[in-house]
Every structure is written in structure tokens, then in C-alpha cells.
A protein has these predicted regions:
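Extreme N-terminal starter segment of soluble prokaryotic enzymes
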Residues: 1-4
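Pocket-lining segment of extracytoplasmic ligand-binding domains
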Residues: 145-251
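Short hairpin/turn module used for nucleic-acid contact or packing/dimerization
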Residues: 290-316
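Secondary-structure end/capping motifs
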Residues: 220, 226-300
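Short helix-initiation/N-cap motifs at beta->coil->alpha
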Residues: 30-41, 94, 132-171, 309-316
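Short, glycine-/small- and polar/acidic-enriched structural segments
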Residues: 11-130, 134-137, 141
């Protein structure tokens, strides 16, 4: 049976994309491309049989009862987001609590990176999110003609920025801070810096204290396909697990390293010391706490209006 799938091109997915690993019993035509485009194709047109998807947007769609997909416990993208918080150094922001009363920009209010970082700020650092004025817009280049913002209860404040770019507004001082996946072009100008200068240490500390390694994206499958082909989820999980095994094996090679990072093997040792031997786990058992934490973030931030059980999100 021929299926269409779309994934980001990562070390843990590359063996699927290039054909080294195949899905037993199914002919999957894998595609890759910009993740925002992949997500749009999935959520707006439901044109893909298997796809990588934003965890937050998948959760919101499922809670509303409008998602045609169900998830596998496979997480192609995970990321601590402490490093994604940029600030003006002249606004008296020395700690997370100092963000209260400030104007903070972000590309999208509902995406997983923003959800997780706000959840960490509130739950771990005690920041009152409703005391921040959130400004949603494009960061370094114009991407959209319409900026969507959610309807949130008072006193939450979320506004759309349709004229300027958030990076420019941070540089000129019209914003006090910015959540951005990648360093904005204004970094280093006019005192723009990261709130957490040694973010990797702060992220490791967060994991040691909470046991949560945030999930950004999840792999989902069309529900109707799972109903017709109950063996598909297991075949996919096995294939993704094998692709991940190949990626980890490549990281372990020291004789002729596969990556240009000079201390990649040391980074691997460090990751295992902090996160455990299987530092990028698949499966529900190893990820239950992280998933339930992020569902809680979404509920607390009013992105979903009801509790969502793991059984609604993931294949049995």
C-alpha cells in the first residue's frame, strides 16, 4: 500500500528519508521541506497520511475534536527553550520574574516552543503570565499577511503586530524581550542578549529538577488508516526506532567522526549523564511525565478548554 509522509530532515529521520530504513509492509513515499509548510498541509488540508506535527497544535486540534490524525509515541524534535528568550539589557530584566509588566514578542502564541517556554516560566520560575503583554508577529522577515491570535480570558493580553518585525522592535526598544527559535538578527545590538547567558546549564538544571525533556513535534498518522491497517503503527514505530538507532550509532563513531563538531563524543557523554542512556526516548512509558506536563501547560494557558487523556492523542 502506497502512503505519503512528510518529515523534517534530521539525523534521526534521515535513514527514512533516504530509503535506508523502510516501513515493513507499507510503501511510504517520504517528503521533506520547511516544517511550517508541512504543518499547514497536515492541519489545513489533511493531505498527508503520516506527518511530523507541532505537539501543541495537534493537542489543540484534538481537544476541539477536529484533528484527523492520531499520534505515535515518536518525537522527531525535542528542545529545551531557555535559550530562545532574548531581552533588552537596559530594561532591568535580570531574572524571569522581571519579565512581568514587560512587552514580549513571539512568532506564534499557540506553537509548542512558546507554550513550553511560557509553561517553564510560570511553573518553574513563578512568573505570572497574565502580567506580560504578548506581541505576536513575524521575527526577522515578513512571512504572513494575517497574524492570528487566540481568544484568552482577561487579564491575559495578546496583540498582533502587523506593521513591524519583532526583531526590529526589540532593537529599537519597542519590545522588552522576544521568544525566537533562532537568534534574531538584532542579537548583540543595542544591548540585546539572552536572559539565560549559560542556557545549557539552566536547561540541564531544569531537567534534573523536573525530569521533563520538552517535546516539540510528534509523528501522527491518519486515524482512518490506523482503523483499516492496525499493523501500521507498530511498523512505523519500528522504522523510526531503527532510524534513531542509526543516528545514535553515527554519533558514537570516534575514529572518523560523522559530524564537524570537535567535541561531539563529549557532548554525547554529557547528554547521557544528564538525560540518561536513552536520552531521546520513544514510547509512552518514558515520556508520560513530559506529555502530561505539556498538556497541563496548554490547559493552564487556556489553549485547550478541557483535560485531554493520552489515550485520545496516541495509538494504543
Amino acid at each position: 500500500m502506497k502512503l505519503t509522509g512528510a518529515l523534517g530532515d534530521f539525523d534521526r529521520t534521515r535513514a527514512l528519508l533516504d530509503g535506508r530504513v523502510r516501513v515493513a509492509g507499507f510503501d511510504v513515499e517520504w517528503q521533506s521541506g520547511e516544517l511550517e509548510s508541512i504543518f499547514s498541509r497536515a492541519l489545513e488540508g489533511a493531505e498527508l497520511d503520516i506527518t511530523e506535527l507541532s505537539f501543541s497544535n495537534f493537542l489543540v486540534a484534538t481537544a476541539k475534536g477536529v484533528c484527523p490524525y492520531i499520534a505515535l509515541p515518536v518525537f522527531p524534535t525535542r528542545c529545551f527553550r531557555h535559550h530562545a528568550l532574548f531581552i533588552r539589557g537596559d530594561r532591568g530584566i535580570r531574572a524571569p520574574a522581571d519579565l512581568e509588566g514587560k512587552r514580549i514578542g513571539l512568532r506564534e502564541y499557540t506553537n509548542t516552543a512558546s507554550l513550553v517556554l511560557r509553561g517553564i516560566l510560570a511553573g518553574y520560575y513563578g512568573v505570572k503570565l497574565e502580567r506580560i503583554r504578548w506581541v505576536v508577529g513575524d521575527v526577522d522577515r515578513r512571512e504572513r499577511t494575517t497574524i492570528r491570535i487566540p481568544e484568552l480570558p482577561a487579564p491575559y493580553q495578546v496583540v498582533a503586530e502587523t506593521k513591524g518585525l519583532l526583531s526590529d522592535l526589540l532593537e529599537t526598544g519597542e519590545l522588552d524581550g522576544l521568544i525566537a527559535y533562532a537568534p534574531p538578527r538584532c542579537l548583540g545590538r543595542n544591548g540585546v542578549t539572552r536572559l539565560f547567558e549559560r542556557w545549557w546549564e539552566e536547561e540541564a538544571r531544569y531537567f534534573k529538577d523536573t525530569g521533563v525533556f520538552p517535546i516539540m513535534h510528534v509523528v501522527v498518522v491518519r486515524r482512518s488508516l490506523v482503523e483499516r491497517h492496525p499493523g501500521l503503527p507498530r511498523a512505523l514505530l519500528d522504522a523510526f526506532s531503527e532510524a534513531k538507532r542509526i543516528a545514535i550509532r553515527d554519533l558514537e563513531i570516534e575514529s572518523a567522526p560523522r559530524t564537524m563538531l570537535p567535541w561531539a563524543s563529549a557532548n554525547l557523554i554529557q547528554a547521557r549523564e544528564v538525560l540518561g542512556e536513552d536520552f531521546w526516548p520513544y514510547g509512552l512509558a518514558a515520556n508520560r511525565k513530559t506529555i502530561e506536563t505539556q498538556i497541563g501547560f496548554s490547559r493552564q494557558q487556556h489553549l485547550i478548554s478541557r483535560d485531554v487523556a493520552l489515550e485520545e492523542l496516541f495509538v494504543p
